[in-house]
UniProtKB/Swiss-Prot annotation:
It comes from Vibrio cholerae serotype O1 (strain ATCC 39315 / El Tor Inaba N16961). Belongs to the LysR transcriptional regulatory family. The keyword Cytoplasm applies. Plays a role in the positive regulation of NhaA. This is Transcriptional activator protein NhaR. Its main location: cytoplasm. The lineage of its organism: Bacteria, Pseudomonadati, Pseudomonadota, Gammaproteobacteria, Vibrionales.
Length: 296
């Protein structure tokens, strides 16, 4: 049996990972026709059909699933090899981290500090996006690690792992005058700034409103927690939701006032990484760190 053309195998692997020829072609900087031709050559070599159409997506046939399983292990090992070579040869380790935009930037910053080794041999690059987009980039080996507000579903994303780092209670704050009314009923008379409905925290908040029988006036929804706080500074009549550790600013920053705590709602923090990154020194630092004193 003659040797396999690994370029053909790689293009097939990318199509399976991306779910379509067009997306794979974009990722490979090739035309869809070129990718299709390469997969056809692989099918001729293996004497069998590797893909089939399912609506607008491409999925592997039974033979394709078998080939993809081995290809996934092969190319996963190749990326792992490159990472290990990179660790041993670079004076500064390049470490690309994706951060879910819904998370508190202050807490994220403190978590990231633990990723930096004592000798500072690291070149940290941070990128913000949604949980879903970051997972896609991690699966494509464009990121080394993710900090997010929800774990990864290993059944949907094989080869990816998550570890819970901690959770923070949530509270409502305002930069304006505070009414001495019972909480949470006081929220009915306020303009609220809350996390976006597509975020994990946004869904938790709305469920809590329903349980409390509240129908508040929502002035704005924000996926970015830092932007929500900045907006609240310039709209002092609004009330915004943030991790409870913000209460430490109430004394130091006199204009910030606590409206009330919500013990039932917790903002969770997870680190997500690929199996090949387990030995990365920065990932190990984060996974091994004790964040007990960081979260309220």
């Amino acid at each position: 049996m003659s040797h396999l053309n690994y370029n053909h195998l790689y293009y097939f692997w990318m199509v399976c990972k991306q779910g379509s020829v067009t997306k794979a072609a974009d990722a490979l900087f090739l035309t869809p026709q070129t990718v299709t031709g390469q997969i056809k050559a692989l099918e001729d070599r293996l004497d069998g059909k590797l893909t089939k159409r399912n609506g607008r997506s491409i999925e592997p046939t039974e033979l394709g699933q078998l080939v993809f399983k081995y290809a996934d292990r092969m190319f996963g090992l190749s990326y792992e090899m490159l990472d290990i070579v990179n660790y041993s040869q670079r004076s500064n380790l390049l470490f690309d981290v994706g951060v879910a935009d819904a998370l508190s930037k202050r807490l994220v910053s403190k978590i990231l500090l633990t990723s930096v080794p004592g000798d500072n041999r690291i070149h940290l690059r941070c990128f913000e996006s949604t949980h879903e987009m970051l997972l896609e980039q991690l699966a494509q080996h464009k990121l080394d690690m993710i900090l997010s507000d929800c774990p990864v579903d290993s059944s949907q994303s094989p080869g990816l792992f998550s570890k819970k780092l901690g959770e923070s209670r949530m509270s409502f704050f305002s930069f304006g005058d505070v009414d001495f009314a019972p909480f949470p009923a006081v929220l009915q008379s306020k303009k609220l700034l809350v996390p976006g409905s597509r975020t994990a925290m946004g869904r938790k908040v709305r469920q809590w409103f329903d349980r409390q029988g509240l129908q508040p006036h929502i002035l704005g929804e924000f996926d970015d927690s830092a932007l929500m706080k900045a907006f609240a500074i310039y709209h002092s009549d609004a009330v915004f939701m943030a991790p409870s550790f913000y209460v430490s600013e109430v004394d130091a920053e006199s204009s910030l006032k606590l409206i009330g705590h919500v013990d039932e709602i917790k903002e969770e923090y997870y680190v997500i990484f690929a199996e090949r990154m387990i030995q990365h020194p920065a990932v190990k630092n984060v996974c091994d760190a004790d964040f007990t004193n960081l979260f309220l």
